[in-house]
């Protein structure tokens, strides 16, 4: 959790039965400014991503499961059936993703998405307040065979209810 430094990867190749994906380079930088402030940045030709704030790598998935579990019955049932965790996440961070193209995302998750302009995803997670917000803007995209001039997605829980909005312009 207290990593400092860089990892640089040159000529990354991901192989799948349907398609191969090549990434000319990838750089990850992690810095810990103090016990309450960290930053992880990942930069490649296809995307730039960052997470900044107070977080623990080992509790990031648990944070999302606990917040979403209050609103999604399937998450709550999974949580109840597992052994209780001995730690409580106290994450409070913001995240930012700039996606120049969706080729890697489409290959890894088998989503038929093509971007014709860069997409952005921004948001935050705050465990103490039990809050999360994620907003995505995708200008000019194709999903399957359908072209959209733009799309906007918003997921948040500002009060004690979960809201999700999606808008697609053809």
Residue ranges and their predicted role:
Residues 1-170:
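Interface amphipathic segments
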